[in-house]
């Protein structure tokens, strides 16, 4: 009798376990349309990251069919089968002397995929501290919709530009004088403080769209003129241009498909 009870409990456990698995599959499949799979398979897709200086380790990737992978770097790194990144060497050290100038140049590569990857339909930019751990096709099928061209994260810790300015000044990522100038300018233009705050370490773009190119160009000009902390200016440009094609990626998807590592040279601002 005892053995029968144990067997019943085991059967009941597996019944509920597989039922939960099946529900999760149904949830995923409900977000994936067969037409989207056909559409996605026709797109030329590129994943790229930027490694300037020695702030981060190189995180190897497992290549997925239908994607090309590029790393823009000033480091002496060769293409090799261990990392699977195709290296694009960029020499910024002669032309750009200060650390902030070099960071702003990094932002140029970050905001201009249409110049470097014009033969691709869709790009995925990931910060060098990110590693890919999940299936990218599945990730894209869960976030892409026809009417949006830019996809990125919402900031996990702050939601207003004033709080971000305070954090940047407190952790000395920019001078207090510059953060005051930015705040004054935004106030004069009536940029609302509660307009949201993006986190820009992961950006998916249909980067050849003309409106997307215009948005990215204006964003970079703002970075170049003011702060290299690009999260200070993204939502300002979003508001200023009245661009309607930005969509935030649910955080649960990024943790499912990407792993975030700490910088070697730790950036303590969160």
Region spans (language model):
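GT-A fold catalytic core of metal-dependent nucleotide-sugar glycosyltransferases
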Residues: 111-168
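Short acidic (Asp/Glu) patches
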Residues: 101-112, 138, 170-188
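A residue-level signal for conserved active-site and pocket-lining positions in enzyme catalytic cores
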Residues: 47, 69, 114, 129, ...
